[in-house]
Amino acid sequence: MKTLVLLLLSFSTATAFAAYGLGLGQAPKYPADFRAYEYVNPDAPKGGVFSLPIQGGFDTFNPFTLKGDKEAGVLTLTVDMLTDNSWDEPFSMYGLLAEDFWLAEDGLSATFRLNPKAKFHNGDPVLAKDVAASFRLLTQDKAANPFYRIYWSDVAKVETPDDRTVVFRFKQRNAELHMALGQLPVFSHKSYPEGLEKGANKMPIGSGPYRFVKADIGRMSEYARDKNYWAQNLPTRRGRYNFDTVRFK
């Protein structure tokens, strides 16, 4: 604990203690040692096929651009966010890619410390540079959906003091911004080296619970559960994503 406190103080003279979870306006419901969310079966069996009907077709696998009809599974199944929001609280977040996080006491920055076990589907570790690249691409690339730029518009800059630490500096106090940043979808910096426009039909390299298998453009897409998913035993993931195959058609 002493080492952790010294580490936090090294970033800023106005820092708060690292947290496993945060709630907006209230303490998080779940304790630090929770095993799984109450609404899931932590020992649920794995297997089977889950087919989901989709209204309309799709013409792109890139979920971040404004143009095109998006395929349904890429963002929800193959990409992890910094944190995970529980479904039985107004607005609370718990660790996923970020194992802990904190809002500075002055309210002008938020820091996320990455889980050292996190890795992308290509085997690369999830590093601070990937988080920074994801944020910058989504908020600065002209082809990106403007939602991202608006949603995080009070972020002045992002810093990466080391491979596992990401600091977001704010333009002004914003009561919800640190929570909104937890919803950042993180993908490898190798995903779109030439920007989103040239990668308009390219899916990101993610770290999520499923991997893309195949698709019939506009009609069907299929995903397989990653049996080596790095986060499968985290409390925010235990008992979830149980089907071996998920199919949209």
Label each region the model flagged:
Residues T3-S12:
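Sec-dependent N-terminal signal peptides
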Residues A14-A18:
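Sec/Tat signal peptide C-region and signal peptidase I cleavage site
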